[in-house]
Amino acid sequence: MALVTCHFFSDVLQVSTAMTVLLPQATRSQIGLSGVADDAPPPVLYLLHGLSDDETIWTRRTSIERYAAEKGLAVVMPRGGRSFYADEVHGGAYWTHLTQELPELVSSFFRVSTRREDTFVAGLSMGGYGALKWALREPGRFAAAASLSGALDIVSDQGLRSVVPQVWGGGAPGTGDDLLGLVAAADPAALPALSVACGTEDFLHAANLRWLDAARARGIDVRTDVDRAGDHDWGYWDATIQDVLDWLPIRGR
């Protein structure tokens, strides 16, 4: 695969920012790794980082390049700061950047598919929250969305109290940022395939169960992995992202 560190200016954020991108490359003589690519623009996974991380973290803490190579999958890992992928009250318009500006820049910079059936989103912790929020608010964009140890109940989570003032001001997150509210109002027939994974030792496990209860009450089918041991750490995420990639409905596989 090609590993691209892409620095660019964001008109939405009004600052230079970055993304890490993996692009498929067909390889035959590389020792220990076989890459897959064809003439068609490859499917693309938007892979979001957590609260304390950046656009490089997935490539530094997991073998995402190795896992994606055999699937012919492009992976876009944007910088999201500590924004919860929202338009911050005291900060940047990260939601607008992620959902409007970034896909346009990706398609202009790189040869990747823009078809819904070839487009996926996933993330861990804050990124898991962001992935489901994007899928619930723009279901027509994605074929599948996955949350790994996601912060799925930001309204009730006391651990996020320090983040709320910067992102949402003095009040609680609004309905457009509340995943419990979004899933309760979602049209099950319009949604992409959804997957939620969270280890039983994770401090966010109870929040994941609450969100899954709300999804079931709405009649939404979700692939779940919430009964397996695991904590809020990279050992769990490295293993689980492999399961997610195997689950994605990648064409021709």
Model-predicted segments: where are they?
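Non-catalytic cap/lid and distal C-terminal segments of serine-dependent acyl enzymes
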Residues: 1-253
